[in-house]
Amino acid sequence: TYFKMFNGAEATILVECLRAKNRSAPERVLKRMKQRLAAEKLRQQDEAWLVVDKDSWNGNQLQQLYQWSTGDKRYGLAVSNPAFEYWLLLHFEDGKGVNSLRECRDRLKRHLPEFHKSHVEVHKLGNGTRDAIRRARMRDQTGRQKWPKTCGSTVYRLVEQLVADEKESN
């Protein structure tokens, strides 16, 4: 997955992804996280992030995730609207004018013709991570809602920290 690229032999961070096929509803994502945290407590320097797509989930469902993320300073929430593919697209372009998931995927495939959601070829993202962070931050108009209402991604908030931690470890 995308986040595994931050795990390296020299890294002082370890990114673990809790995945479950076809169980991406916000309440299921939150349940898996709570189960994991009950089984394995966070250390002081650890963080736990929920990374979800807006998809067709409603505001009340996402609000549950947001509420959880405010319960501990080590918790975070990253939402991409319409989906994580939008965050990947920002590695290559500014993402303006994307109005649907289909359009987002079509534009992403211009840059990653072999793209498949279950296997992101991170080596093909090149040095676009910092550009993606910059572009996502510029588009971040979340305000009081805490996640993008239109096309956007707050994944940059997590990736910024991963990049900073990676830099500190080198």
Show where each model-derived region lies:
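C-terminal accessory helical subdomains adjacent to catalytic cores in phosphodiester-
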Residues: K4-K21, E27, M33-W49, K54-N170
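Short N-terminal binding/cap micro-motifs at the start of the first secondary-structure element
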Residues: T1
